[in-house]
């Protein structure tokens, strides 16, 4: 069907496009992607706007009329658990926020996600906009590999009753709901109490999330090949409130003190869970990973230096 249509026969290969909305250069890039896939006989679905009240912000996508281009055939879909079903992958045009939106859809369909950075740092993206044609060529030829990134499963208990469930790719951030005063918590690891303290919040992160919010809060950078859980207190009022790195099989629990403030749990900064005073948050390794499209084998150190523009002048390296 022609651009903007929403029905038709599904092709053997189909890719879901999730793009940051509202920027002319991204719209033009998205159309370019569509034309390349059209020539290769690959169908393209395009995510359009849909508001979901359980999210902090809408699941933004392209407007349908942005693909009204003669000769360009796309399928318009709305955000939801079935948006990516049957697709080969989810392709992202944008920054890390757009990638995290797309990761929800990719995880729900158990398919990989490929990020093309059109944002600022874009740490989650696999490649930059200037390498778009090369990246799409590899996709067309199926010259890519898939890497599994661990996730977090999150639940909230009140008196042993589970009242909320969620998941995260980067981090679960436990915060004071009112942002006034101090959130009093007790940290538990594998069924044993570790420390009680007042704080602005507690971050529980994956290695993938170690370069995101946890990094800003003073946590360590963890190579994605290493499977672990990170616990990073935020502005804690305690002598011992250091970042911790635990086994990926650990159960991390944070109990809010009864009579303290109500809180919220932010999953990837996108999905919220209610946290009444006296409730308990439990975080474990997620059952369902996010599948990552890798186009090259560049070391993580090179990616980190490039994304953060780290100075390496004076490095000599080991002589062969």
Curated annotation (Swiss-Prot):
Organism whose genome encodes this protein: Rhodococcus opacus (strain B4)
Taxonomic lineage: Bacteria, Bacillati, Actinomycetota, Actinomycetes, Mycobacteriales
Similarity annotation: Belongs to the NAD kinase family.
Name this protein carries in UniProt: NAD kinase
EC numbers on record: 2.7.1.23
Residues the entry annotates as binding NAD(+): 96-97, 101, 170-171, 200, 211-216
Reported function: Involved in the regulation of the intracellular balance of NAD and NADP, and is a key enzyme in the biosynthesis of NADP. Catalyzes specifically the phosphorylation on 2'-hydroxyl of the adenosine moiety of NAD to yield NADP.
A cellular component annotation (GO) from this entry: cytoplasm
EC category: transferase
Subcellular location: Cytoplasm
């Amino acid at each position: 069907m022609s651009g903007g249509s929403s029905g038709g026969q599904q092709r053997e290969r189909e890719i879901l496009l999730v793009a940051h909305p509202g920027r002319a250069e991204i719209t033009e890039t998205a159309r370019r992607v569509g034309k390349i896939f059209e020539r290769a006989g690959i169908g393209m679905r395009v995510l359009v706007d849909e508001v979901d009240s359980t999210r902090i912000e809408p699941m933004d996508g392209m407007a349908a009329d942005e693909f009204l281009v003669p000769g360009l055939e796309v399928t318009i879909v709305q955000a939801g658990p079935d948006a990516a079903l049957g697709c080969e992958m989810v392709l992202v045009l944008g920054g890390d926020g757009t990638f995290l939106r797309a990761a929800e859809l990719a995880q729900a369909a158990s398919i990989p996600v490929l990020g093309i950075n059109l944002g600022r740092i874009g740490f989650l993206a696999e490649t930059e906009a200037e390498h778009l044609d090369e990246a799409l060529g590899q996709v067309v030829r199926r010259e890519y590999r898939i890497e599994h990134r661990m996730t977090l499963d999150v639940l909230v208990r009140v008196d042993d009753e589970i009242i909320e469930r969620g998941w995260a790719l980067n981090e679960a951030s436990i915060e004071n709901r009112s942002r006034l005063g101090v959130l009093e918590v007790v940290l538990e690891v594998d069924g044993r109490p570790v420390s009680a303290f007042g704080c602005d919040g507690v971050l529980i992160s994956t290695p993938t999330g170690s370069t995101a919010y946890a990094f800003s809060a003073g946590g360590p950078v963890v190579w994605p090949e290493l499977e672990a859980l990170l616990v990073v207190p935020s502005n804690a009022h305690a002598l011992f409130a250091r970042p911790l790195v635990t086994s990926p099989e650990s159960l991390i629990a944070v109990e809010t003190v009864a009579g303290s403030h109500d809180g919220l749990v932010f999953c990837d900064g996108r999905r919220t869970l209610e946290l009444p005073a006296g409730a308990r948050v439990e975080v474990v390794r997620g059952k369902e990973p996010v599948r990552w499209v890798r186009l090259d084998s560049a070391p993580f150190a090179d990616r980190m230096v490039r994304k953060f523009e780290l100075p390496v002048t004076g490095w000599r390296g080991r002589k062969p």
